[in-house]
């Protein structure tokens, strides 16, 4: 699975999860506020975790406190809510945001390029400060930083849009600095001997993927008096009286860890740190991810349309000398059309889903960065909102301008294959080309992808339209009632290739009780009870298989003759005891949505139209195009299947199932792709562990294997 959202959340490794599972079966913890032996053991584990965290950041308990929090946002909010801004010199609340740093007492500042969790703190401190400043990161490089007192700067250590920022020691000497390290810790170890900020906020899942729901606030000990706890909760006091205002706060760390802490989550942190060590430490991870980012940028920059126009617009700061120290493992970009217009990021995300690529789109909860790199103004934000634009929605272009971007980010488990699949997706879906793209499957391994079932179809009557459902019961013959009926004329089987008149019919089975056949215009309808007493017919040979059948009777035959404008038509049904149905070669036909999309784009045909023409039972999403050709077996949840063969295609796919008209373009596109090989598309599969009462459902996870 090409996972390219490590800045959002990195992934735990298989070894890490196995170690955690073993730990959970052996570990028994208790409320650390109690005093029995299990509670004392819990206290010791928590204390050990604090020391392990400090060691990771190259500091000790002599210099920093460790306060456990729910996440980075929670840690930042603790600082903002409890910071001592001193006595204000102005009345009222701040009504305007300054674009420069202010001097004097009671100031709050943050970068333009900050996460919304940081920007939102301004409303926490609104009534406590004289000035709020939102500044460009270049301001901290200036020699003259205004002198302040009792002031807080929430400093973004690394933009989740682009790059890490450098901390100016002059800033630290004048302000209380709270570092938002959420994005930074995903690929870099913050060394607290090189920089000694007053506060550091981060989440552990950003470092090693698991556990979620637990973060930390590191507080420099000589800065601890700059925040003051004015309330208390369970486990936070030394003494309290419910009838008076008397209370005395316990030690610093527990004062801010209100209630019972996440002891099991804290115990799991050790396995995360061990995982980082197995990878060679964060320095090795940073080198690995920087190398991948460099290769990705090189590939993206090389993409051009036939007219020479660039396909990818990468957002960067040209004046910065790129290195592992100045560049995070993040690439933000948009895709550009041959006419210099933009592809919307929602369209890109949908194509990525087809290819199994997971990345981030939008503004990444960082509107300041979007404004800076996309040329959006404050007025445009308000205007866009009046047009319906909301955070997290699918409105990706307004007046032809992007409202967000595409972001890829790398982690310790990222590989070059992730980049290769992204390259294939861009080449297939967004590079203007006059010839079909032929992806190379040699470097890709299908068993590393995690696709899902997106569509299920059955065909009650062979060569008649499909029935789409989200759930189908399995039988030894395939989906229940799939190809259970067959139309014959003069004892010869009718198929769509030779008799496009069949496209006039649709069929569905209602509650396993009735077969409903309709003309396409729905002017005529035939209902056949599934319990109808049928007349046994001679066995029929269909695709070299001899199948016992029943005749559905004269009334049904007459209806078909009228609907198809033919004579001597009969509807046959597979005999109940038969282990075969009217499928051509195998109980199931599986196709890959990305392969469909690639052909659709080449001939400018609707994807749903092509899906209908290929008449599959199972459609999967989340694979690169045509990689399904390499599979030998697969599983859908706990259902196991073997690959019987590839499906060789004929001119039947040229028939428009809606009109019966023939158009050879799809077959020609497939021929061009196969390049003198058999024109196959999709794979035939057969279940190998069938048991009665099994079902397959849309949304189910699929695993492919090549052995």
From Swiss-Prot:
EC numbers, comma separated: 2.8.1.9
Record's catalysed reaction(s): Mo-molybdopterin + L-cysteine + AH2 = thio-Mo-molybdopterin + L-alanine + A + H2O
GO annotation, biological process: Mo-molybdopterin cofactor biosynthetic process; molybdopterin cofactor metabolic process
Keyword Transferase: yes
Gene3D superfamilies with a match to the protein in the record: Aspartate Aminotransferase, domain 1, Type I PLP-dependent aspartate aminotransferase-like (Major domain)
Record domain MOSC: where: 558-705
HAMAP family in the record: MOCOS
Family: Belongs to the class-V pyridoxal-phosphate-dependent aminotransferase family. MOCOS subfamily.
Name recorded for this polypeptide: Molybdenum cofactor sulfurase
């Amino acid at each position: 699975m090409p996972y390219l959202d490590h800045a959002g959340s990195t992934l735990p490794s298989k070894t890490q999860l196995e170690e955690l599972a073993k730990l959970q079966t052996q570990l028994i913890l208790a409320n650390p506020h109690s005093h029995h032996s299990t509670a004392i053991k819990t206290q010791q584990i928590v204390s050990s975790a604090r020391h392990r965290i400090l060691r990771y950041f190259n500091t000790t308990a002599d210099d920093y406190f460790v306060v456990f929090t729910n996440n980075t946002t929670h840690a930042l909010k603790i600082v903002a809510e409890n910071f001592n801004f001193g006595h204000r010199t102005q009345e009222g609340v701040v009504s305007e945001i300054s674009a420069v740093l202010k001097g004097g007492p009671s100031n709050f500042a943050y970068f333009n390029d900050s996460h919304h969790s940081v920007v939102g703190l301004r409303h926490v401190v609104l009534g406590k400060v004289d000035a709020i400043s939102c500044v460009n990161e270049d301001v901290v490089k200036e020699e003259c930083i205004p002198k302040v007192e009792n002031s807080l700067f929430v400093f973004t250590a690394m933009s989740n849009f682009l790059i890490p920022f450098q901390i100016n020691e002059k800033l630290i000497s004048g302000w209380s600095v709270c570092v938002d390290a959420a994005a930074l810790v995903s690929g870099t170890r913050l060394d607290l001997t090189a920089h000694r900020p007053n506060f550091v906020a981060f989440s552990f899942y950003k470092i090693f993927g698991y556990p979620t729901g637990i973060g930390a606030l590191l507080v420099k000990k000589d800065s601890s008096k700059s925040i003051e706890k004015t309330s208390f909760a369970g486990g936070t006091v030394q003494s309290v009286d419910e009838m008076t205002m008397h209370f005395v706060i316990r030690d610093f760390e527990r004062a801010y860890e209100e209630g019972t802490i996440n002891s099991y989550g804290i115990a799991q942190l050790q396995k995360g740190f061990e995982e980082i060590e197995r990878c060679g430490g964060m320095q090795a991870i940073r080198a690995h991810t920087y190398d991948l980012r460099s290769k990705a940028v090189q590939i993206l920059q090389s993409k051009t349309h036939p007219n020479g126009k660039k396909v990818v617009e990468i957002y960067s700061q040209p004046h910065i000398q790129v290195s592992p120290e100045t560049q995070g493992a993040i690439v933000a970009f948009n895709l550009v059309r041959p006419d210099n217009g933009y592809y919307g990021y929602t369209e890109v995300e949908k194509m990525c889903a087809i290819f199994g690529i997971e990345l981030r789109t939008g503004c990444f909860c960082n509107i300041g960065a979007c404004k800076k790199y996309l040329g959006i103004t404050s007025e445009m934000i308000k205007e866009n909102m009046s047009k319906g634009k909301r955070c997290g929605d699918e409105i990706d272009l307004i007046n032809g301008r992007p409202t967000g971007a595409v972001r890829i980010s790398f982690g310790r488990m990222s590989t070059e294959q992730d980049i290769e699949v992204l390259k294939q997706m861009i080449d297939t879906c967004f590079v203007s080309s006059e010839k079909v793209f032929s992806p190379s499957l040699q470097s890709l391994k299908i068993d590393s992808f995690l696709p899902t079932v997106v569509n299920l179809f059955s065909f009650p009557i062979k060569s008649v339209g499909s029935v789409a459902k989200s759930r189908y019961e399995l039988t030894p013959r395939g989906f229940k009632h799939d190809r259970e009926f067959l139309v014959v004329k003069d004892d010869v089987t009718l198929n769509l290739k030779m008799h496009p008149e069949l496209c006039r019919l649709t069929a569905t089975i209602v509650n396993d009780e009735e077969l409903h056949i309709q003309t396409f215009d729905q002017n005529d309808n035939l209902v056949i009870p599934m319990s109808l007493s049928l007349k046994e017919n001679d066995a029929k040979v269909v695709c070299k298989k001899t199948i016992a059948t029943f005749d559905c009777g004269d009334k049904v035959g007459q209806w078909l003759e009228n609907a198809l404008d033919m004579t001597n038509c009969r509807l046959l049904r597979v005999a109940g005891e038969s282990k075969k149905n009217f499928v051509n070669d195998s109980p199931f036909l599986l196709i890959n949505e990305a392969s469909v999309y690639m052909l659709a784009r080449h001939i400018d045909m609707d994807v749903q139209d092509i899906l209908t023409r290929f008449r599959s039972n199972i459609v999967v999403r989340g694979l690169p195009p045509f990689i399904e050709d390499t599979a030998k077996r697969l599983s859908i949840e706990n259902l196991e299947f073997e690959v019987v063969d590839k499906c060789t295609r004929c001119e039947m796919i040229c028939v428009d199932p809606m009109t019966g008209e023939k158009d050879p373009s799809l077959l020609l596109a497939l021929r061009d792709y196969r390049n003198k090989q058999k024109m196959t598309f999709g794979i035939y599969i057969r279940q190998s562990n069938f048991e009665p009462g099994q079902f397959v459902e849309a949304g189910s996870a699929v695993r492919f294997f090549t052995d």
